């Protein structure tokens, strides 16, 4: 908890002395604001209480992507540590992944089938945290003004956002996100940077627009933009109260979805590289499969004793 920061006026300052973590802005570190939420604080303290009883620590991550941090943890912590990610439902993605397995998938997958390749921006900001209504309106109007095709998972605000966003895309209450991200028409992913969404975007080789809200999402955004270089930030001051305006959003989306842009081409190239790293990790004899087998072997030894 000592790394939680109060960063008013100093958010762009950087620190480079945290073991295993490359230079990072203060604003991207965990905030003390998180600890004011009693439910979150209880979960954090509960997790800390388990450390002394723990024999194994499994990370839903890929060693090659966070090797420096993992190596530091292995050196500092007494338990065995294994990276076994990405732990998502299925790995063989491709054109067959758009096959409909649920009647509720029909409308949005049929719509995606009719869109040009890499032309649709997929938007999802998670279900746990939310942005203000004012910011949501700015995003919707900016999206409309960008004239970019989109698919937005908005849950409780579907009807209202449909009216604001115009007719360039779909607003739906739910979707099978992995199916959508692996669809050939998807060219970008506006994400809150939850860890599962981040991994799914990487595995599907989709460039990311990062819009973190709280908890670990700022650090995930930093990894996406600065370390892995597979995405762009929507909001520079992630803890500031000022809105990202509709004009800023429209310009950014239009630029991000321009497949002829050199910056976009480079981001897409990096996304392809990260996808290959993910695929190698979960392939036979890859790092994640090797770690899973090693963990099972260790458990078997314990049972034998």
PLM-predicted stretches and their roles:
Residues 197, 208-210, 214-215:
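Short glycine/proline-centered loop/turn elements that form peptide/ligand docking sites
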Residues 1-179, 188, 204, 213-215, ...:
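Nucleotide-sugar-dependent glycosyltransferase catalytic domains
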Residues 169-170, 184-197, 206:
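Acidic donor-binding loop of glycosyltransferase active sites
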């Amino acid at each position: 908890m000592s790394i939680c920061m109060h960063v008013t006026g100093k958010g762009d300052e950087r620190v480079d002395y945290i073991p295993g973590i490359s230079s990072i802005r203060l604003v991207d570190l965990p905030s003390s604001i998180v600890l004011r939420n009693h439910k979150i604080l209880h979960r954090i303290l509960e997790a800390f209480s388990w450390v002394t009883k723990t024999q194994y620590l499994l990370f839903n991550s890929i060693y090659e992507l966070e090797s420096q941090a993992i190596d530091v943890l292995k050196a500092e912590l007494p338990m065995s540590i294994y990276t076994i990610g990405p732990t998502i439902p299925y790995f063989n993605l491709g054109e067959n992944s758009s096959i409909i397995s649920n009647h509720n998938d029909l409308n949005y997958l049929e719509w995606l089938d009719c869109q040009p390749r890499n032309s649709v921006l997929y938007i999802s900001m998670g279900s746990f945290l939310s942005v203000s209504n004012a910011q949501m309106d700015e995003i919707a109007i900016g999206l409309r003004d960008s004239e970019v095709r989109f698919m937005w998972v908005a849950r409780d605000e579907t009807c209202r956002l449909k009216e604001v966003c115009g007719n360039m895309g779909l607003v739906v209450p739910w979707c099978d996100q992995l199916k959508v991200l692996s669809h050939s028409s998807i060219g970008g992913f506006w994400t809150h940077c939850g860890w599962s969404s981040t991994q799914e975007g990487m595995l599907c080789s989709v460039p990311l627009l990062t819009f973190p809200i709280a908890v670990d999402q700022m650090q995930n955004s930093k990894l996406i933009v600065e370390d892995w270089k597979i995405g762009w930030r929507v909001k520079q001051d992630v803890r500031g109260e000022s809105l990202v305006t509709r004009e800023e959003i429209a310009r950014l989306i239009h630029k991000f979805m321009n497949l002829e842009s050199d910056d976009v081409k480079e981001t897409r190239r990096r996304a392809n590289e990260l996808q290959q790293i993910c695929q190698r990790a979960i392939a036979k004899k890859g790092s994640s499969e090797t770690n899973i087998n090693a963990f099972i072997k260790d458990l078997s030894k314990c049972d034998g004793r």
